[in-house]
Amino acid sequence: MKRVTLLLLIFITYLPAQQMDRLFWNGSDWRRLEKLADYDPELTYMMKIAYINGILDGRLFYYLKAWMIEQTFADSLYAETVDYLTPRELVKVLDNFYADPINGYIPLPSAIIISNMFGERIPMDTIDEYIRHSKEWINRMILEQK
């Protein structure tokens, strides 16, 4: 009986953490991974790689689901290149991107697109425009929630 109670207590404790929307993690969440990994660089790197691979796998999954229904729509919806950089390069670029406090509240999916834009050598005007739109979008979304 004590084991069941203990397992139930652990499950209830971790349940709210599972409900957290990790899709909208931003720079503060990205930087917090170091603290969660107890400042171990290898563990921090593995956690960041796992997050990036999860986002890319999820994107591929939903692209393929949409592609089965309507190929043209799926191709236009998922037109951004998010796999130009390797995951290792992407971690480095994201670390540098979030080192600037101004970029701290841009969601990670947008930061991944921006990082790949840097890697593809897209003109800075276009990248700055995308960053501005990302900031406006997240600001609108935050204000609508309140």
Located regions from the model:
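Extracytoplasmic/secreted envelope proteins and their assembly/folding machinery
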Residues: 48-59, 91-95
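Compact alpha-helical subdomains of small soluble proteins
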Residues: 19-28, 61-146
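Enrichment for repetitive, rod-forming helical segments
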Residues: 9-10, 55, 66
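Sec-dependent N-terminal signal peptides
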Residues: 4-13
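Immediate post-signal-peptide N-terminus of mature secreted/exported proteins
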Residues: 18-53
